[in-house]
């Protein structure tokens, strides 16, 4: 509907993952939407958090994420590629270039973004943290011989206009959601590899119920202070 009802705006998945949606299926769907929109389709992809954890499974590996990006990009752009031992191609595609946006916070994800992606998707509104993320992406792009300024950045955070206290309560779920990614990073990386402003607020987190994922008023957000809401959201 959006592809056929618009003429200039770009369209993007926000975000898919290679675990719950097989890469060739994603590629086929994107190729169709790219054709319908006249070449305005982008891929937004990550490791998969709630989509996997609600099934009791971990997000996909960075290796599988990178492979999925290469497979989806090649197929949508009309190029053949080997995947799981088979040469694949979608000969009917329009052949338009597929911009790829990777969602992630950790050093490895940010380096991957700088190395192979067209854009970084950051679920956060804190300007200082965004600067840190952007520096990681651009340093990686430069190390890969790419122009760092060609890698775009999108900061995705909820916004609320109205009463301040009400706005904080209605957006408090968002830092709690982000906290799931942050806990993964804390468990994976040395403390000095991550900004203190990103990791400190999850230390009092007791757990997360995925049956109430991204839910306004959920007890998942009980550990999130007003100060954290103000940093992560636009209220």
Predicted features along the sequence, with ranges:
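Active-site beta-loop-alpha junctions enriched in small/polar residues
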Residues: 16-18, 46-50, 105-107, 125, ...
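Glycine-rich anion/phosphate-binding loops
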Residues: 19-32
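An alpha-helical appendage that flanks or caps ligand/catalytic pockets
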Residues: 58-90, 130-235
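Hydrophobic faces of well-ordered beta-strands that scaffold small-molecule active sites
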Residues: 11-14, 41-45, 100-103, 120-122, ...
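N-terminal beta1-alpha1-beta2 module of alpha/beta enzyme domains
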Residues: 1-13, 98
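Loop-centered beta-sheet repeat module
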Residues: 98-141
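Short, acidic/polar
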Residues: 26-29, 104-112, 170, 235
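Glycine-enriched alpha-helix->loop->beta-strand junction motifs that scaffold or abut catalytic
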Residues: 5-8, 37-39, 112-121
């Amino acid at each position: 509907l959006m592809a056929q009802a618009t003429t200039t705006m770009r369209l993007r998945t926000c975000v898919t993952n290679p675990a719950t949606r097989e890469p060739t299926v994603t590629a086929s769907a994107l190729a169709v939407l790219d054709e319908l929109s006249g070449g305005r389709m982008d891929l937004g992809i990550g490791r998969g958090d709630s989509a996997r954890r609600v099934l009791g499974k971990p997000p996909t590996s960075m290796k599988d994420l990178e492979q999925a990006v290469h497979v989806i990009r090649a197929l949508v752009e009309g190029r053949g590629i080997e995947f799981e031992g088979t040469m694949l191609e979608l000969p009917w595609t329009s052949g338009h270039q597929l911009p790829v946006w990777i969602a992630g916070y950790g050093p490895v994800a940010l380096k991957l973004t700088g190395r192979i992606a067209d854009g970084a998707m950051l679920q956060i509104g804190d300007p200082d943290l965004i600067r840190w993320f952007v520096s990681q992406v651009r340093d990686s792009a430069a190390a890969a011989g790419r122009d760092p300024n060609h890698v775009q950045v999108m900061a995705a955070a909820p916004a609320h206009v109205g009463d301040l206290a009400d706005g904080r309560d209605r957006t408090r779920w968002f830092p709690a959601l982000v906290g799931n990614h942050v806990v993964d990073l804390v468990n994976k990386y040395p403390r000095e590899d991550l900004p203190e402003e990103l990791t400190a607020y999850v230390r009092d987190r007791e757990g997360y119920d995925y049956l109430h994922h991204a839910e306004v008023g959920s007890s998942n957000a009980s550990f999130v202070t007003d100060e954290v809401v103000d940093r992560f959201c636009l209220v």
